Amino acid sequence: MDYPEQQIQHIIRSLTQYSHDDQRTALQDYFLPDAYFVHPFCRVPSFGNCKIPYTDLTVNSRQLVFYIYQWYRILSPDIKLSIDSTSFDKDKNLLYVMIRQTFTLWFVPLSLWQANVKLVTVLELQQLSTDKSHKPLLGETSTPVNGERPPKLYFIKGQQDHYQIEDFLQFVAPWGASLLWMAWQIYATIICTVGVIFLRTPVALCQKYFLGRDTRAIKTL
């Protein structure tokens, strides 16, 4: 990627909404072979090419990420997705993407079950020199060609998907579980409020006179 914030939308749609070939192309073009993947439901640790015993086949972590995205498309062939915002921290090489999606299962009739969720995807990027085919030069020293160094592009080193708990619950416990969690959150807020109103003074006095602690952080009214 030359411009991660502008190009990431096409990459995400290729992975989640387009064809099998588009998925594979996006992963091969933009993900490093040892890319890792972290999601509430699954995890792929980073590893390079490993030979499968008793075969001539090799596998790397990017291949497993491809299988995850393929299974995602198999379960939900018609995913509705929108990208609300992107932000690139160039110093840390982190790209943040806020996404809204509607996930439905193909075997549930009449869309009786849908998960309308929001998530923040954090992509760890790595800037590497590339060859003539725009492939990363992994572990190689870039040599100048005609006095010019090979161009550098950003590649995805890893992906982490972050969900709020109420959004996560829509996948594992639909039909009201997220509402119960929201009710618990409101209850916890009430407990915090009541605790401050009725317990701040006795707690501050106890900490000050019995424990000798500085109580300015919970200064009483």
Question: Where are these predicted regions, by residue range?
Answer:
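C-terminal and inter-domain tail/linker signature
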Residues: 1-221
